[in-house]
Amino acid sequence: MNPAHLLILAAVCVSPLGAFSNRPMPLNLYQFKNMIQCTVPNRSWWDFADYGCYCGRGGSGTPVDDLDRCCQVHDNCYNEAEKISRCWPYFKTYSYECSQGTLTCKGDNDACAAAVCDCDRLAAICFAGAPYNNNNYNIDLKARCQ
C-alpha cells in the first residue's frame, strides 16, 4: 500500500478517537448545566457537581438537605427515563428555552428527550428554591452517605 494512503487512513481512524476523548462532557450534561445557569445565575453550575450525597457521581444514603434531595429526585427521574426504549439520559439531547429564569421543554422532543428535559428542568427549578450550604460541598461520602 502507498505510504500516503496509510497516512490518510491512520488520520481518519485516529481523528474520531481524539474527538471522543477530548469531549468535556456529554451534550446532555452541557444542556443541564445551562438550565442550572438559567435558574441559578449567581452561582456556578460547578457548585452542584460535588454537593451532598447525590449531586454529582452516584448517590447513596440519606440526602443531607433539600438541595441534595433535589439531586436524589433527579437521579430517580433519570432512572425512570431509562425505562423508555433506547433512552440514555446522560447522552440524550433535547429542545428547551430559557427566558428570564423560566425553563420550557419544547413540544418537538421525542418521548425520551421530553422525559430527560423535564428531569433536568425540574431539578434546575428545585436548585433555585433550595438553600445552598457550603458545608455540604465536597463532603466525606463514606462518613456521611451510608
Curated annotation (Swiss-Prot):
GO terms for MF: acetylcholine receptor inhibitor activity; calcium ion binding; calcium-dependent phospholipase A2 activity; phospholipid binding; signaling receptor binding; toxin activity
Cofactor binding note: Binds 1 Ca(2+) ion.
Active site: 74, 120
Propeptide: 22-27
Record-listed E.C. numbers: 3.1.1.4
InterPro entries linked: PLipase_A2, PLipase_A2_Asp_AS, PLipase_A2_dom, PLipase_A2_dom_sf, PLipase_A2_His_AS
Keywords attached to this entry: Acetylcholine receptor inhibiting toxin, Calcium, Disulfide bond, Hydrolase, Lipid degradation, Lipid metabolism, Metal-binding, Neurotoxin, Postsynaptic neurotoxin, Secreted, Signal, Toxin
Cofactor(s) the protein requires to work: Ca(2+)
GO annotation, biological process: arachidonate secretion; fatty acid biosynthetic process; lipid catabolic process; phospholipid metabolic process; positive regulation of fibroblast proliferation
Gene Ontology CC terms, in alphabetical order: extracellular region
Keyword Disulfide bond among UniProt keywords: yes
Disulfide bonds: 38-98, 53-145, 55-71, 70-126, 77-119, 87-112, 105-117
EC category: hydrolase
Residues engaged in binding Ca(2+): 54, 56, 58, 75
Segment forming the signal sequence: 1-21
Reaction catalysis annotation: a 1,2-diacyl-sn-glycero-3-phosphocholine + H2O = a 1-acyl-sn-glycero-3-phosphocholine + a fatty acid + H(+)
UniProt function note: PLA2 catalyzes the calcium-dependent hydrolysis of the 2-acyl groups in 3-sn-phosphoglycerides. Is able to suppress the acetylcholine (ACh)-evoked current mediated by alpha-7 (CHRNA7)-similar nAChRs in L.stagnalis neurons (IC(50)=37 nM) and to compete with alpha-bungarotoxin for binding to muscle- and alpha-7 neuronal nAChR types, as well as to AChBPs.
Membership in a protein family: Belongs to the phospholipase A2 family. Group I subfamily. D49 sub-subfamily.
Protein name: Acidic phospholipase A2 CM-II
Naturally occurring in which organism (per UniProt): Naja kaouthia (Monocled cobra)
